[in-house]
Amino acid sequence: MQEQYRPEEIESKVQLHWDEKRTFEVTEDESKEKYYCLSMLPYPSGRLHMGHVRNYTIGDVIARYQRMLGKNVLQPIGWDAFGLPAEGAAVKNNTAPAPWTYDNIAYMKNQLKMLGFGYDWSRELATCTPEYYRWEQKFFTELYKKGLVYKKTSAVNWCPNDQTVLANEQVIDGCCWRCDTKVERKEIPQWFIKITAYADELLNDLDKLDHWPDTVKTMQRNWIGRSEGVEITFNVNDYDNTLTVYTTRPDTFMGCTYLAVAAGHPLAQKAAENNPELAAFIDECRNTKVAEAEMATMEKKGVDTGFKAVHPLTGEEIPVWAANFVLMEYGTGAVMAVPGHDQRDYEFASKYGLNIKPVILAADGSEPDLSQQALTEKGVLFNSGEFNGLDHEAAFNAIADKLTAMGVGERKVNYRLRDWGVSRQRYWGAPIPMVTLEDGTVMPTPDDQLPVILPEDVVMDGITSPIKADPEWAKTTVNGMPALRETDTFDTFMESSWYYARYTCPQYKEGMLDSEAANYWLPVDIYIGGIEHAIMHLLYFRFFHKLMRDAGMVNSDEPAKQLLCQGMVLADAFYYVGENGERNWVSPVDAIVERDEKGRIVKAKDAAGHELVYTGMSKMSKSKNNGIDPQVMVERYGADTVRLFMMFASPADMTLEWQESGVEGANRFLKRVWKLVYEHTAKGDVAALNVDALTENQKALRRDVHKTIAKVTDDIGRRQTFNTAIAAIMELMNKLAKAPTDGEQDRALMQEALLAVVRMLNPFTPHICFTLWQELKGEGDIDNAPWPVADEKAMVEDSTLVVVQVNGKVRAKITVPVDATEEQVRERAGQEHLVAKYLDGVTVRKVIYVPGKLLNLVVG
């Protein structure tokens, strides 16, 4: 073997071998335990970033480890290829989204191969191909026939610049997350899937997900937002209809002093006919976005509608206000306000001088002080007529029962979760397979017209979707009658909700899934991706699995047994202030830094001499220009070094700070491993290891080897603390580097140790390990080698450390054979100078001996 470690030479050779041998291609095999390891599929943006590299390295380490345990391991990859960025890039580069996307896929595929990930490339899929989305379209038509799909007019966040609907989460500070244009409210007809029909199951089955992070489960619970309460009907004077509100706190009902309705509510619209102030307010609300996260913090505003509702229990008239914190699409579009016991209602009432009536006593039994804030804790009722003295639960039931008996109340279970709006007014997505006939009938596209293919050879003007701009595209014939196709496309969360299942049978032509293959591989054993997907993707992913189960395609309730959310990758961020006061972000690669004695950055400038402001470590991003190109790092250090650093620098679920000094350290370590194997193999063949003939020192070294195997196995397999596994291998390497290599058994022991080290490192650094395994004459390819097993006998300690005390004070620590008797330990202790000194001329009155640990001599 060559003396120097040259990753640029070995890595491409090993990758070619994997390609030619199709090492990672798998098929169903009932005789083997399966393991399905999946990382979230990437969007083909054009280049991999370090976040991708971290995600896929974690997945590859787990997949290779499980393979070495003898399991049938599936690790597929594909491309989440539809979406808005392709449209923007196409306009910018004067091309169409399809060629831009396919070019990116080809480029990024090479980048993934360059990093040595062990994917089954025969299963690669791209969600923008008709071969993929045809089954999604077919499934949608089946859901429609089952009554799980409907169309309704809905208020949306509309970006006038991108001409598209935005999800609440895509509205930041009232503006579009992508182009920063002010968002408007707009009513348009859209398609919905009834995820609410599965709300209870989605909620209850979270309890089955023992190996999902609690944070993700809590976020989903809150998002589904199940609550039990009462729906109450109010009569409104001089108004033709009643108002219905929902409350989870009927115990506070006697403190209700006003009602609030959404600006879009029919009552507000009617009142605005003669109220210019209210009309202007409604207009303002129409153009304000309603992302829930912002609802809590935005300024609460309202206008009195002039209508008065009648409190069903007290008969009092209470005002009805239009307020910006009430949403038409949540519940009934109206809420009851109890300012004494709800902080939002309190702030609104204080601002507009509305009545605040306390009805719950403070914890000490006194009347609450409402001069500064509402009392939101539960407690005993007062000021509530016949309900005085009741605690929360009793009052909840008594008031609910009375309202029900009067015919103005009904107990209800409510959900925050809304049905999933899947319509997007974009071009680059899967066409929604619905048609409208000449007579106005709306129906699913017939099976013989599926897939509805998206034309790829289009011209983008950056404003109108090409399939909306071309009236011919929508024309079709159904049942002999002219019809128009739907020109909206699916939300791209549709494609990413079922791809994991299609990986089990990507070539299957008879339907969406081959149930036999799907049920062999599913559920996914470990799913790896960022926590930012906790509520949207991961909820739709679970929902789709249940839909496919109910369609008879899969036989499990949940799509993934374990979820691992990797931490973000951070890097140093620098900027200088430009002439107009703007911040110009400078890549950390271009920053020349000075550090103090503790290694902290104290000064920085760029090549042009600008003084740079250092803002610390922050998430790698385009906006701060602090991304590090993985390709540059691989070309500089090799893929194995980058992978090793990624897994060593931080626990997988914590943030990782990118430090090139750490990358250099990982590279030095691999050079040391190479050097040790080189020096060992240069001495020629090795004799067989005779464990019975080992010296004490050799036994001690072998004990270290097998203890390391045991620790690394536990760290990777059970604990998934990959960084501590690598640290243990490094520690063992330090010992091996100092071990004698002269004797026959020294070399035999070194051979055993190096074969173990190379196999333990293999999941992390597969190229160097593939090569070193061959140099060490390991059996076959390392890709088919079994994981090393710790020898229990080798780990047994021959000797143990005993603490010797005289009258409870430590006087010595002695090493004795594990099987030494108490007499032998006392005799050995007596040979210690300090112990002998304290025993001289005194009588030992009592001996306390804890075998193998402690000897305490009580003297007097």
Curated annotation (Swiss-Prot):
It is an enzyme of class 6 (ligase). It is found in: Cytoplasm. Gene3D superfamilies: 2.20.28.290, 3.10.20.590, HUPs, Isoleucyl-tRNA Synthetase, Domain 1. GO terms for biological process: leucyl-tRNA aminoacylation. GO terms for molecular function: aminoacyl-tRNA deacylase activity; ATP binding; leucine-tRNA ligase activity. It catalyses: tRNA(Leu) + L-leucine + ATP = L-leucyl-tRNA(Leu) + AMP + diphosphate. Its EC number is 6.1.1.4. GO terms for cellular component: cytosol. Belongs to the class-I aminoacyl-tRNA synthetase family. PANTHER family: LEUCINE--TRNA LIGASE, MITOCHONDRIAL (PTHR43740:SF2), LEUCYL-TRNA SYNTHETASE (PTHR43740). HAMAP family: Leu_tRNA_synth_B (MF_00049_B). Monomer. This is Leucine--tRNA ligase. It comes from Escherichia coli (strain K12). The lineage of its organism: Bacteria, Pseudomonadati, Pseudomonadota, Gammaproteobacteria, Enterobacterales.
